[in-house]
Design a protein with these regions (language model features):
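Metal-cofactor-dependent catalytic cores
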Residues: 1-152
Length: 152
């Protein structure tokens, strides 16, 4: 159970940038990310998606989407993220709490659509599989290759 890729965007709708390491701050999220220190709703600190879901989507629909296509911050491998909603877990040395499923929107559907798959089909396929939103409970660094564990 590891972090495979790390992305952030400096502004909403801005280009995604890939990093090997990111600094995350408790209650604020990823330093430099578009949602850093966003207030109002729980789960805005950081988002995660399973690499396997994107790979399965590509295999099912014959597409070639990159792992950044969902615009989630962390791309994981070997962990079923939906099982982490309501639980605390550790990535590297950072403690997180899964807040909610990050359900797909029509914007994501449109961005992943192709001649072979409609936006509505994208959304339908990704329901309950498009990742999770999490709160950052402790500050630290997350790096590609970082291991996951369930908090005790």
């Amino acid at each position: 159970m590891t972090i495979e890729r790390i992305f952030l965007a400096r502004q909403p709708g801005g280009a995604l940038l890939e990093f090997q390491h990111i600094l995350v701050l408790a209650g604020a999220g990823i330093e430099g990310d578009r949602y850093f220190n966003a207030k109002g709703e729980a789960g805005q600190n950081i988002t995660l998606v399973e690499a396997e879901v994107i790979e399965e989507f590509n295999a099912t629909f014959g597409t070639r989407h990159e792992l950044s296509c969902t615009r989630r911050n962390l791309v994981t491998r070997g962990v079923r993220l939906s099982l982490l909603v309501g639980k605390e877990f550790i990535v590297g040395n950072v403690r997180l709490r899964g807040v909610e499923l990050c359900e797909p929107c029509m914007g994501l559907g449109k961005s992943m659509a192709s001649e072979a798959v409609t936006p509505a089909s994208v959304v339908k396929y990704l329901v309950h599989r498009a990742g999770i939103r999490a709160d950052v409970l402790s500050s630290g660094t997350i790096s590609t290759g970082a291991e996951f564990s369930i908090a005790a």
